[in-house]
Structures are given as C-alpha cells and as structure tokens.
Amino acid sequence: MRRILAISLALALAGCATTPPPYIGQGPHPQISRGQPIAPIDGLGNVFAILTKIILWNWKVENHNISAKTEEYLVHYVDLPESITDGTHYSLNEYNPGMALSRLAKNKKVKWPYRILLGIPTTLIVDVLIPGRLFAGLINGDMYNPYTDTVSIYSDLPSVALHEAGHSHDFNKRRYKGTYALLRIIPGVDLFQEYKASQQAFKYLTDTQDHPQEIEAYKVLYPAYGTYVGAYIPIIGGSLAGALVGHIIGRSEASSKEKEYKAFPPAAPISTLPTTTTSPAALEAVPASQ
C-alpha cells in the first residue's frame, strides 16, 4: 500500500506529459516552464506553508498558484538587456526531477567537482526527494539552485520572483560560480547573497518606478531577510524574532515611501510590463510545458 501511495504521489506531482494543460500566464518563453495545476497537491502544499505565510504575513507566499501578473514581471525582467540571466531556467510551481538532473549534468557554468560533491545531494534533496511543489514553506521554498542554474517559484508575488531572479543575476555575473555557491557555508555569506538578490529586485522596481510593487516588496522581502539575520541569534525562535524586526523596518519604510510618492508623484511613470494583453481564450490555446 505504501508503495502504491508513493507511486501515485509521484505521478500526481509530475503530471501527465502527453496531455499538457493550458499555459496560464504570459505565454511560452524559452526560459520559463510551468507545472500542471493539481488541486489536491497544491492545496496540501498550502497547508504545509501556513507557518511561513504567518511569519511573512502574506497568504500569497508559497500558494502554488502563480498568476499571469507575476509571470509577466518575470518575463519582463528576464528579457531586459541588463539582466544577466542567460541560460537560467525558471520553473513555476513545477515538479520535474528529470529536467533538474539533466540540467545538473549539463550546467557548464559550474565546474564538475562542485556539481558532483554539492550539486548532486542538493538537487536530489530539493528537486527530487523533498520537492518544493509539495513542501515549499515547510522544508524549502522559492529558491535558486546554482548547480542546475534553475529558479523555482511557488509564491504568487512579483517581489519574490524578482528576488529569486536576482540570485540568478548575482551568480551569473560571478566568474567562479561554484566557489561562490560553496562560500555560502561560511557564516554571513548567505546574508550578503540574500542582500544582493533583494537589492536587484528593488533596483528593478525603482528603475521602472513601479511604486505599488516596491511598497509591497518592503513588506515581504524585509521580514524574509530578517529570518536569515535572526537565525544567527543564539536563542530559540531567533528567525521569528528577526522576521518581526524585518516587519517593523519594512513596513516603516513602505509607509515612508508611500507618503513620499503621494506628495511627489513621478512626472511620467515608467511602465514595467508590456501594454498588450492576452485574452483568457488565447491563453488557453497556448500549449504548456509540463
């Protein structure tokens, strides 16, 4: 019975490759794929992520339902000339262990010793055995895997998608990417890397003068960063304490920016997204990747 349940779960996570669902979002992009919506799996994933949702105080965190709007932000960022994300794959609420292992084997950006010693165990854990498609928010979550050069997104938040894309940008501009990934085991390096990723997200939102999303980003990325800082506090619940401080600072900054933008609105706001829209019927006609 356990074997049958395990096989059934694996098949449900993987979806059916021969009958792909309609692609929901911006549409086919060579660097983006989306998993098939599976209500029982996605619903259970939401339950597993409740604690993370509470800590970050946002129900869209790890909600396994990425909207067209969030994907549009990702598409626009990836296609910017200044975004160094060539070759990076963006996987939206998807369980595809075959693709993950294939990308691990073919990712020449990271030298083979790093991929064997660090990439294999990392990928087996986060992409095969304990996939974010089900366990995001409980064990893992939105993340960038430098060994497969893949961003996995499960939250319907543009700021989170841009943050993870910022990790790709940060890693891809490094000459020694494997070493940069290895350095994360040194205390404090993770804080630097998380800061650089969030900095890239905020840069995009401020450059495009997307004030609503910038204000929302302060409320999400600051407490998220606080969990990393709090993890270094030698007390029980350090990450939670860090998140609370992040909420205070982030919401204070958001309030300050909101007042500033109301008092001094930009003369000519810059559009962050393509002005064309796609009808739901047209979207349903576009085939999906798994």
Regions inferred by a protein language model and the residue ranges of each:
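Long, well-structured alpha-helical subdomains associated
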Residues: 17-19, 186-190, 202-275, 290
